[in-house]
């Protein structure tokens, strides 16, 4: 359908138009970037194994920071200061989720993630936090598995959440067992990254393949979380996943400045049912426009799904009718 490529062009064009004027790279860093662990030795060690609690904001952010630090040398040929590292999109998206309250407990049964309680806590009931778990743990553990970290594959263990433990994996072995295809895609990305002949566009291709595969593996496991949010926020969550697929299709470059500008167009807080874009008064014009485009994408996707279902039903009914006619004639 012609609308979808057009939508991607409009959205990417909106982000590209906002790129001017960003020169201080330190301003683009995610929240509490400097306070996050920057090397494996910053984590607790037990029996020669690094123990990481990904349900604490700083510890999960540290996983991203270490990946960025360890892969910086491979991106030096594209630009100085690691600005062209296409892994920046992951921590910047995570930082946006934290800053906008999307990692907090949406049920409000606990004070996890709230300023009035444990503001560093990441709630396992958060849809955003659960999907981001896999967008942090799988690339991190694949980096370990592919040799980027310089340690053996059995030297890192992630701690489980307080509930729903079986929904997650915690080390290279268990994640490989649960998500073999996706872990292979992350490994392929890192292996190609380490090649002296790696090209920027091909790196984007491998990265987006791994990214979208990660979401596809896990999106259905957390559909029950939609019930914890307003209809507007749940709609936005579904739209966000669709947007990722289409940004992947055009190989959107998730470098530092571009990813930072991308976040500028995202909603600055959790959506309420009273929010109607483009008329949300505490959103910028850019944020209102982006939300309109995202909502439109979800509506079009639903329409396409409905049409495909109807066509399938027509084909099925026609086939059954033809079979009955053949049986009567024979």
Swiss-Prot record:
Identify the glycosylated residues. 24, 69
Q: Where in the cell is it found?
A: Secreted
List the InterPro entries hit by this protein, alphabetically.
Answer: Leg1 (IPR008499)
Q: Which UniProt keywords apply?
A: Developmental protein, Glycoprotein, Secreted, Signal
Quote the cellular component terms of the Gene Ontology held in the record. extracellular exosome; extracellular space
State the tissue distribution: Detected in saliva and in hypomineralized dental enamel (at protein level).
Q: Which residues form the signal peptide?
A: 1-20
According to its UniProt record, which protein family does this protein belong to? Belongs to the LEG1 family.
Instruction: Name the PANTHER family for this protein.
Output: LEG1 (PTHR18820), PROTEIN LEG1 HOMOLOG (PTHR18820:SF1)
Job of this protein: May be involved in early liver development.
Put simply, this protein is called Protein LEG1 homolog
Question: What organism does the UniProt record list as the source?
Answer: Homo sapiens (Human)
| Lineage of origin | Eukaryota, Metazoa, Chordata, Craniata, Vertebrata
Give the gene name: LEG1
